[in-house]
């Protein structure tokens, strides 16, 4: 089968002819229809420091996808051949304390599809049936293919009450932009998103952000005055991993504010803890999606009218995968879809 593999420990990703994966009694065999390129895939392509420490070589990459079930393990219940599915990319152990307590998103032994094991950039993917999620008929393939990053946005955004609240999002990557759309959809008052990439800020405006702020040219506190905000943001969603962005968030949070952190800093990050202490801030780390509450919320949000379509900006045939990676690496894109049909 065709597959995109991290074949060598250097920059790049390569089309290979890989053996069709073998499935176990509890697995599904999924024929991939569409995949999306994640920022993680770009890290793997670039072969940066994180990738060098994390990624086994060779390995088929990719973890954002939609496909069709074409075979079902003999112990599997609840899935049938022909089901349209995406899936949770965090394969959990099932036996640690958190797994046994039903908090599987906090499994300490997680293995990542397309990160620690072969992934979805292939004609076929084997996935434990536990991890699969049936896609409702009224959700198109393009949106189903980005459920993984959409789930990061939903998990982060819905960590705290948003109704009538003022929200600051630092980092206008696709996940931050989708989080802005979620916040507005569920009833936040002002949703302000910051970045220095004007292309991405324009996308955030299309997706409903109250204000998309280029911090290279605008002062965040001036924007707050413009919006009539007198006390600070109630909720912060840190999506960038950039220290200066987090520092700006701490400076502009209201007392008693709540911060959810998804962005991963490139190294250790010094912060002024006195601001957190004296403001009484609550900080929550976010990793992945809650299994499977976040997934049901994702489907329901789309079915209730949340429009994510502007975030998908490019489509390519899998044979043109290099063009897709070039678009993602340029920073001048939203989500990039690779078609496998």
From Swiss-Prot:
Binds 2 Zn(2+) ions per subunit. It is found in: Cytoplasm. Zn(2+) 2 binds at residues 93, 96, 99, 107. It is an enzyme of class 1 (oxidoreductase). GO terms for biological process: L-threonine catabolic process to glycine. Keywords: Cytoplasm, Metal-binding, NAD, Oxidoreductase, Zinc. The record marks 148 as: Important for catalytic activity for the proton relay mechanism but does not participate directly in the coordination of zinc atom. It holds the Pfam family ADH_N. Zn(2+) 1 binds at residues 38, 63-64. Signal peptide: none annotated. One of its GO terms (cellular component) is cytoplasm. SUPFAM superfamilies: GroES-like (SSF50129), NAD(P)-binding Rossmann-fold domains (SSF51735). Pathway: Amino-acid degradation; L-threonine degradation via oxydo-reductase pathway; glycine from L-threonine: step 1/2. Homotetramer. Catalyzes the NAD(+)-dependent oxidation of L-threonine to 2-amino-3-ketobutyrate. This is L-threonine 3-dehydrogenase.
């Amino acid at each position: 089968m065709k597959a995109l593999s991290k074949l060598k420990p250097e920059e790049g990703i390569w089309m290979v002819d890989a053996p069709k994966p073998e499935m176990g009694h509890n697995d599904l065999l999924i024929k991939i229809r569409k995949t999306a390129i994640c920022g993680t895939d770009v890290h793997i392509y670039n072969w940066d420091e994180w990738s060098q420490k994390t990624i086994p070589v060779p390995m088929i990459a990719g973890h954002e996808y939609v496909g069709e079930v074409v075979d079902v393990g003999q112990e599997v219940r609840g899935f049938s051949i022909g089901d349209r599915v995406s899936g949770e990319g965090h394969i959990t152990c099932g036996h640690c304390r958190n797994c046994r307590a039903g908090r599987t998103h906090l499994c300490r032994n997680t293995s990542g599809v397309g990160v620690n094991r072969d992934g979805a950039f292939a004609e076929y993917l084997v996935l434990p049936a536990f991890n699969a999620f049936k896609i409702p008929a009224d959700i198109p393939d393009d949106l189903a293919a980005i459920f993984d990053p959409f789930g990061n946005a939903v998990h982060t955004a819905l960590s705290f009450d948003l109704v009538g609240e003022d929200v600051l999002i630092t980092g206008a990557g696709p996940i931050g932009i989708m989080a802005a759309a979620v916040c507005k959809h569920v009833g936040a008052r002002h949703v302000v998103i910051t970045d220095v990439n004007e292309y991405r800020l324009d996308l955030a405006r299309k997706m409903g952000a109250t204000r998309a702020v280029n911090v290279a040219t605008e002062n965040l506190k001036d924007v707050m005055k413009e919006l009539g905000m007198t006390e600070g943001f109630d909720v912060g969603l840190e999506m960038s991993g950039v220290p200066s962005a987090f520092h700006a968030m701490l400076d502009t949070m209201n007392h008693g504010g709540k911060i959810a952190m998804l962005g991963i800093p490139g190294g250790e990050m010094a912060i002024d803890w006195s601001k957190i202490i004296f403001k009484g801030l609550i900080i929550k780390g976010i990793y992945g999606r809650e299994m499977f509450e976040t997934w049901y919320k994702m489907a329901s949000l789309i079915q209730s009218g949340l429009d994510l379509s502007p975030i998908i900006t490019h489509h390519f045939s899998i044979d043109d995968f290099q063009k897709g990676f070039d678009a993602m690496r340029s920073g001048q894109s939203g989500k990039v879809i690779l078609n496998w049909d």
